[in-house]
Amino acid sequence: MSLNSSLGHRKELSNLTEGASDQGGSGVTEFVAIVIITVFVCLGNLVIVITLYRKSYLLTLSNKFVFSLTLSNFLLSVLVLPFVVTSSIRREWIFGVVWCNFSALLYLLISSASMLTLGIIAVDRYYAVLYPMAYPMKITGNRAVMVLAYIWLHSLIGCLPPLFGWSSVEFDEFKWMCVAAWHREPGYTAFWQIWCALLPFLVMLVCYGFIFRVARVKARKVHCGAVVTVEVGVQRTGRKNSSTSTSSSGSRKSAFQGVVYSANQCKALVTILVVIGAFMVTWGPYMVVITSEALWGKNCVSPTLETWATWLSFTSAICHPLIYGLWNKTVRKELLGMCFGDRYYREPFVQRQRTSRLFSISNRITDLGLSPHLTALMAGEQPLGNSSSTGDTGFSCSQDSGTDVMLLEDYTSDDNPLHGTCPPKRRSSVTFEDEVEQIKEAAKNPILHVKADVHKSLDSYATSLAKAIEAEAKINLFGEEALPGVLLTARTVPGIGFGSRRGSRTLAGQRLQLQSIEEGDVLATEQR
């Protein structure tokens, strides 16, 4: 009996030793993981906040939502995660009951505000793409501020009930932080999930679904050969002649546009999948865990799964600055410029100021619906004519964060016709990465810009005006015989002589015609 008992004690001691070693190994792994998460959340969101704060021309209406998102994530890394790191070391909460309640409130408040902000960003992209003409009236500065205030108020309403008796706050030994006791009040668990998580997720699905539908519609139009090109030419008389032609699917231009639209469709799909996929991967496991706790009790989920699901929700704060900030080439270039100086500042300051209002951090989605003239009018600036690369369908490729820009005039005219609109004309879309690359691309692929048309029209007008002045001076000084025969024939109207009143009216009419060319046609050419 003594031998058997000693062997049993040895087995128990060995099991306890193995359990302690396993617990110590898992504790070190958890500590390293939460430290890495905290550092990445803090640094990633901090660089975006600093970039937007110091480069205020990037802080457009759309980017105000992104600024609020990254700022809230940074507050999470400063006010919540350090205490989680400490609790993972001590395996207990040592900061008192008051701070336990406050940290739980902060975690729920910041997490709820982040998810709701993602939904608002999706709504902003929806209006920018599907209703570009109404976008400046729908999304204004005052409304953006009101929406941000509502987001935080909405989140606060969803987070306060545990402090007033509906559920409670407790320290979870497997999450290593103070959270709401999801297993005590299933009703509050369902309320918080619907109020703060499910609602923005459904909004994202609907808005990005419509956006991708628009991309598919535009791609189908190109592949089916329904691309209409409007070419405008100037005749010798100064009048414009418009001819409309439909490009065939077998032509090089249509084939190229089909490839570009197909690439745009793929990139739009990738962007949407990344945004929605990041939300589902980071928050999905946590929602499953708290739902299981509310339905089947606290011990229905393994401690390891509970810990990693909670900490996986923290990684959503890492994904946000990557998706909405560092993924964009312009933001990366601004960040590198601040870190390493002018080596990465290839754009002059004036040019950055011109293009700043046309830029959005999340423009992989936004720029799908904004034409250059509309965006420039929103910014209160002139459209950029020398930095556009347009196709005959109004489509252009943006170098900003790999965005492909698609105008939606065709989609609007098909599904949502606007009353009193003008006939469709050739539209252009302004894109930019930096002026150096645009100039190089323009040198490789010559494009007939608006300025070239203006200069050509001005030269033609100046030549015609000089000839008319010379001819009229010769008539006044030397008479009609001084004019060449060809010019005399051109000036003579059948049945009307130069000496009659009708002939003088003809000269006056030509002067008015020249004045009309100067004041009307040139202005129209500049506007075109």
UniProtKB/Swiss-Prot annotation:
Glycans are attached at residues 4, 15, 101. GO terms for cellular component: ciliary membrane; cilium; recycling endosome. One of its GO terms (molecular function) is G protein-coupled receptor activity. Disulfide bonds join 100-178. It is found in: Cell projection, Cilium membrane; Cell membrane. Residues 1-30, 86-101, 165-190, 291-306 are extracellular. Key negative regulator of Shh signaling, which promotes the processing of GLI3 into GLI3R during neural tube development. Recruited by TULP3 and the IFT-A complex to primary cilia and acts as a regulator of the PKA-dependent basal repression machinery in Shh signaling by increasing cAMP levels, leading to promote the PKA-dependent processing of GLI3 into GLI3R and repress the Shh signaling. In presence of SHH, it is removed from primary cilia and is internalized into recycling endosomes, preventing its activity and allowing activation of the Shh signaling. Its ligand is unknown. This is G protein-coupled receptor 161. The gene is GPR161.
